[in-house]
Amino acid sequence: ALIHAFLLNEYGHAVYHRKETYSLITREGEKKEKTLTEEQEKAVKALCDSIDRKAYEGFLLKGVTGSGKTEVYLQAARHALEEGGSALILVPEIALTSQMTSYFASIFGDKVVFMHSGLSKGERYNNRMRIMSGESPIVIGSRSAIFMPFKNLRLIVVDEEYDTSYKQGETPRYNGRDAAKVMAVIYHCPIVLGAATPSITTYYAACQGKISLLTMKERVFKTPLPQIHVCDLKENPPIDRSGLISAPLISLLQ
């Protein structure tokens, strides 16, 4: 009645429920900037230059385990934000979403949102609206996150691009990695396919020059890779009931 009598003005404002998802990742020291290695700096520069060109371009970031690929993703996403855009980081498994989200949220805070099928309808709606409004320009999720309503998408990252979990088995069937490539073409932005052991098709495309190859051969802290010993089971037949464990392995375990 007071509104109709012009004694009060009515305003509308959307309020989205926000879970305290990042309560465990704001410990002191986690927000410190990391010093990039020479290989990381080269990769970041290549991606940032591509973001500035505002055109589709494919990259294969081939780095050994522990080489700091995630930090490269983070720095490239930071540049996308500085240019007024958003970034999508895809991971193959839902279980990896929270791990990646925690890493990014320790730097970007509430600008990070995650999307996957394990969320409730209310959570998916809230996160979708935050993405659409640009409130959370960094989106981390599984393959379904590809179809979010992005605002000025400037970077797409597909981590562990070889993983078969990116393939949707049910109708509609699609490969999340390939769908991400199409989205990169639509949004005129670079796409980064990251892996220590890329798929044959992706690596072949890089070798043929269809996409750019960025390599990181050294670990961040110069720690050596674990030594691998090949054991011929014909010469060292398994001696356990399962028929899987050889005598040398049992000896090392004991």
In which residue ranges do the predicted regions lie?
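Conserved interdomain hinge at the start of the Helicase C-terminal
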Residues: 74-80, 231-254
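Accessory, non-ATPase domains that flank or precede helicase/AAA+ motor cores in DNA-metabolism machines
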Residues: 1-195, 202, 207-223
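Interdomain motor-coupling "hinge/lid" segment immediately C-terminal to the ATP-binding subdomain
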Residues: 209-210, 214-243
